Regions:
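C-terminal-most transmembrane helix of multi-pass membrane proteins
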Residues: 2-3, 11, 45, 224-226, ...
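Membrane-interface helix termini and inter-helical loops of multi-pass transporters
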Residues: 25-37, 94, 142-153, 203-223, ...
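Hydrophobic alpha-helical transmembrane segments of multi-pass integral membrane proteins
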Residues: 8-11, 39-55, 131-134, 154-161, ...
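Specific alpha-helical transmembrane segments that line the substrate/conduction pathway
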Residues: 39-50, 86-123, 162, 252-271
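Specific transmembrane alpha-helical segments of multi-pass solute transporters/efflux pumps
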Residues: 19, 24, 53-99, 104-105, ...
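Glycine-/small-residue-enriched transmembrane alpha-helix faces in small-molecule transporters
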Residues: 1-43, 148-175, 183, 199, ...
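Juxtamembrane C-cap of transmembrane helices in multi-pass membrane transport proteins
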Residues: 19-34, 47, 87-96, 104, ...
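Hydrophobic transmembrane alpha-helices of multi-pass small-molecule transport proteins
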Residues: 52, 115, 124-145, 163-166, ...
Length: 331
């Protein structure tokens, strides 16, 4: 899928956010059944990558040199955009609340704005600053005001590292494809990232545990593999392809702000499938996030991530059983 229109890129970005946002509602039953967060995310990443593999092989026919040229980009996505982000998030939620860790990680768009500010020594466009304030306020309301509290400094440091990994994901995804199809890039990054996470689990760095009985979902008992397959296909395979495709068109800054809609979609799916309450504050938060995205888009491409940053090649968090930060599973 190759697009060039900014409007089409925005639509694809929203589809990606919606896809990422489904993960919490479908993974939560597995977590409640005894799956560890690291086992759930390792399975979704590996299965999602394997689902994309046949499509990637077809899309890469005649384009294998493009994959070789992008080898460092693929490696960076697998190690930083997938594995490191997940690893640091899991480390963070061992000592700080899940909502707090999710809120910190989702501040990645502001990190990108700050990096550009420092590197260009130019104050960002006023609309970008306004959009950033709206987005932060919306995140706090959707994730939950209780996410802001005094917590363990080490946990905060790990969450900050996860935020950096999330920002890196957007910078990598927004780089020119140089002939590499998004589906091929996503498949390679997910398979390699899943193998890294699996290796960390096998060596005991990440705890891996799973159960294989029926799980309740939407008022009925389903085999354990049903929600896992949905998450792997929709929340991982489709979501990563859509995210990478849209980031190439929109750029890292706007794509990262649009991704904040994940928390809104996560709350909506939790309400529809799990019966979780959708509060007026969450609806207001969603409106603020939309306002922030609109402001950033209105600012245009000014102050986008500079080319000097992109060669550094800097998703998407893991839901550990609460709905508000369900997008923690996403990157």
């Amino acid at each position: 899928m190759k697009i060039s229109s900014p409007s089409a890129g925005l639509v694809v970005a929203v589809i990606g956010s919606l896809s990422f946002g489904t993960s919490g509602a479908f993974i939560k039953p597995l977590l409640e059944a005894g799956w560890s967060p690291s086992a759930a995310v390792t399975a979704r990443v590996l299965v999602g990558g394997l689902v994309l593999l046949p499509l990637a092989l077809v899309s890469l026919r005649g384009s294998w040199p493009a994959l070789w040229r992008a080898r460092w980009r693929v490696l960076a996505m697998a190690l930083a955009g997938v594995s490191a982000t997940q690893f640091f998030y899991f480390a963070a939620i061992q000592t700080i609340p899940v909502a707090t860790a999710a809120l910190i990680e989702l501040l990645a768009p502001l990190l990108l704005v700050g990096v550009v500010w420092v590197m260009t020594r130019r104050i960002p466009h006023a609309l970008v600053l306004v959009g950033s304030l709206f987005a932060v306020g919306g995140l706090v309301l959707v994730v939950g005001p209780g996410a802001i509290r005094a917590v363990d400094p080490l946990g905060l440091a790990f969450a900050a590292c996860a935020m950096v990994g999330c920002a890196i994901y957007f910078v990598i995804a927004a780089r020119p494809s140089d002939g590499l199809p998004p589906v091929g890039f996503a498949a390679a990054g997910l398979v390699l990232g899943g193998l890294v996470l699996g290796g960390l689990g096998v060596t005991g760095v990440l705890p891996l545990s799973a159960t294989f009985g029926p799980v309740p979902l939407a008022g009925t008992a389903l085999p354990w593999w049903v929600p896992l397959v949905i998450v792997a296909v929709v929340s991982t395979a489709l979501a990563y392809v859509a995210g990478i495709t849209s980031a190439e068109v929109l750029g890292s800054r706007l794509a990262s702000f649009v991704s904040l809609l994940e928390v809104v979609f996560a709350a909506l799916f939790a309400w529809l499938l799990l019966g979780e309450q959708l509060t007026p504050l969450q609806l207001l938060g969603g409106a603020l996030i939309l306002g922030g995205i609109a402001a950033v888009r209105a600012a245009g491409s000014e102050n986008a991530v500079p080319a000097t940053l992109e060669p550094l090649i800097p998703v998407p968090l893991m839901d550990a059983g609460v709905v508000e930060p369900a997008t923690a599973l996403d990157r």
